[in-house]
C-alpha cells in the first residue's frame, strides 16, 4: 500500500497513505540500507523521503519497515449502495453527497462495464453502482444515511 500510495475510497476524508507515513527503513538498488523519518509526528527539513517513496512503486527502494500514524476506528460505518447505469447520474449523486452536510467518509463508482454478475459484498449486480460511506456514532450515521436516501 505504501509503495503504491494506495488510499482507497476514504482518501478525501482521512488522507492518502503518504500523509500517515512517519518513517521507514528500506534497501535501495545497491543493497544499502536507508532510514528516514522516525516514530513520531514532526516537521521535516529538506527532502521528505517518506513522501517521495510513497507512490514510487518500489523503484527507489524496497521498504522493509514502516512507522505509520493510525486513526481511531469509527464506532460504526454504513455504505449506501445506489444502482445507476449512467455515469452522469453517478457523478452528480457523488458530487451532491460530498457538498451536503452528511459528511461522507468515502465514495466509489463502479461503472456498468463490469458486465453482468458483478459481485460486491456477496450481492450480484448487473449495472453501475455508486457507494457512499458514512462513519461515526450510530445515531449520527443513521440520520445521515436517511438524509441521503
Language-model features and meaning:
Residues 1-149:
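Noncatalytic alpha-helical scaffold of FAD-dependent oxidoreductases
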Amino acid at each position: 500500500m505504501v509503495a503504491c500510495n494506495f488510499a482507497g475510497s476514504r482518501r478525501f476524508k482521512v488522507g492518502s497513505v503518504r500523509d500517515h507515513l512517519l518513517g521507514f527503513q528500506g534497501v535501495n538498488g545497491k543493497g544499502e540500507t536507508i532510514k528516514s523519518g522516525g516514530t513520531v509526528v514532526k516537521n521535516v527539513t529538506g527532502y521528505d523521503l517518506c513522501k517521495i517513496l510513497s507512490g514510487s512503486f518500489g523503484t527507489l527502494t524496497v521498504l522493509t519497515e514502516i512507522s505509520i500514524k493510525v486513526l481511531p476506528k469509527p464506532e460504526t460505518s454504513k455504505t449506501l449502495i445506489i444502482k445507476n447505469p449512467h455515469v452522469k447520474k453517478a457523478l452528480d449523486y457523488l458530487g451532491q453527497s460530498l457538498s451536503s452536510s452528511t459528511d461522507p467518509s468515502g465514495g466509489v463508482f463502479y461503472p456498468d462495464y463490469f458486465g453482468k454478475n458483478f459481485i460486491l459484498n456477496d450481492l450480484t449486480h448487473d449495472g453501475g453502482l455508486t457507494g457512499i460511506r458514512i462513519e461515526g456514532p450510530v445515531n449520527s450515521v443513521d440520520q445521515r444515511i436517511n438524509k441521503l436516501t
